[in-house]
Amino acid sequence: SVKSTIANNLKVKIAFEKLNESKETIEVAIGKKLPTVTGTISGTYSNSDTTSAAGVSTTPETFTDKYKISITQNLYDGGEKNLEIERSKIIYENAVINFYKTVQDLSLKAVEGYLTVINYEKSLESSEKNFDSVSRFLEEVKLKYELGSATITELKNAESAFSIAETNLFSAEQNYKVSLKTFESIVGKEAINLEDYVNVEDNLNFENIISEVYKNNFNILIAQNNIKIKELDLSKEKSSNRPTLDITASTEYSDGSRIDAGSENTNASIGLTLTIPIFQQNIDKSDIRKINSQILQTEIELEDLKDNLNIEVSNYYKNYLVSKSNLNTSLLTIEYANTLLESTQEEYNLGTKSITDLIEAETNLLNVNVEYFNANKNYLINYFNLLALDGSLIKLFEEYLPSYN
């Protein structure tokens, strides 16, 4: 299901195409270091008559065709092209990170959808068991009432409990059906057993998580790369003040003998051009100051991002611990509710407990089971959100990622 999600989701497809687009930026940057080759073909027809006191003179008709090839190669540009290649590689790296981030966000959404399905599935199972038990109790009370061994109050209480159980069952069925449709719309397939696929680590350490977040969080990696890009922009701007050296070679062939007798010419030339920036209206200095300001902004944004992530991790970790504690409490509560139901059933058989007591014990078991499923869902959602923040959630689904090399 994860593979289907990644393969078919439109956001993933867009991120993958942006990755391909940024790959072409590297090709363009490398291509700028190659020579420029141009070819020129021209044709000129000429014919003239001149009238003077001496009479009329006519220049023979000629059609001259020329063929010229020029090659220009930069020999030195202050390192600007190399800087642009390095810059384009970092932009591509950001595209890869953004692709991973898109897949991870989608995987997290799929996980949450899966947990919702499982939660409603378990709630439905408990509601079905509760409905069966209450139905059985109602039939038993009806029989006893007909025999005169049960009161009208007990009968009405059993009917009320049946009505509530019936409503709970209908609600659980609808919730489960809707969750299946929602999950299938996200993933494209039915839910699998996530806990069979993922080995959930029971003890997460806050300091370790924060350390991994600062090293591997996708937003932090992108922000760090943005600083590098701005620093390269600054180096490129400074290199624009340096001289550049280009070499140009050309060869030309012309034939002017197509109509009347003419001539053929072949020319070749080679030259060096040294360009020295002297004054650029202070635009370069202004751009340097602007880029320095942008570098400072991206550095501040990175620190602000770290602070926000620290708060986000703290909240998820707190919720993780609370949900873990609630999960353990729910297990103990279920154990107690099962024991209470068994005890109440025995006492009911002995006549020391009423049908009302038995229905209450059965309903209580349903409620604590539902609470457990909710606690388990919250526990796993907090767990996977922590994995997403430190960038490790994507590792669970790496085998489903398309190749981008």
Which residues fall in each region the model found?
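Alpha-helical heptad-repeat coiled-coil segments that mediate oligomerization/polymerization in large
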Residues: T151, L309, Y316, G351-S354
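Periplasmic alpha-helical coiled-coil/stalk elements that build and connect Gram-negative outer-membrane
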Residues: I97, T102-N216, Y316-N319, S323, ...
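Bacterial Sec-pathway N-terminal export signals of envelope proteins
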Residues: S1-T38, V187-E231, K306, V313, ...
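Acidic, low-complexity, intrinsically disordered peripheral segments
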Residues: S1-V2, E371-N405
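Small/polar (Gly/Ser/Thr/Ala-rich) solvent-exposed segments
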Residues: K13, T36-T62, T72-K101, L221, ...
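Short, charged, amphipathic alpha-helical segments
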Residues: E86-K89, I152-S163, N292, I355-N364
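C-terminal structural cap/anchor segments
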Residues: D287-Y336
